[in-house]
């Protein structure tokens, strides 16, 4: 089944709030606790969840059902604007995991960010135990760079993360 990324619509907000507040829907590698009430709607009113420093797009299947969302946020590797990169992420609902949607959605997000921003570098990180996401990133054209020790605090403890990157000039993936 094919998919596309699209901007979040006002009609999606109730569903996104339920997803983001549901530990089961987020999965054990994406659950970081509850967000303040109303935060999603405040961000939507501010910039439609498509800001210059962070944003979200929904993953929509060809039948119109939503499978999850992808996100990006700016990270800086120096004080100047040219040192900005984006870290990307994905959250798929349990029923849509294991079907190749993660690789395709992250490939599309990379293409979108390279087409509409001036960033040279995209990054993604995932738990060292999340081998499904590691495979998805590699299929989406990302290169494994490093293991970041105790880089993420979640579920009462620190977790090692695998860092991936994709540069503007890297050969596109063949998802």
Task: State where each predicted segment sits.
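Short, P/G- and charge-enriched loop/turn segments at secondary-structure junctions
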Residues: 43-48, 77
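Amphipathic alpha-helical interaction segments
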Residues: 27-28, 39, 52, 122, ...
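A short helix-loop-beta-strand connector motif used in the catalytic cores of GNAT acetyltransferases and
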Residues: 46-58
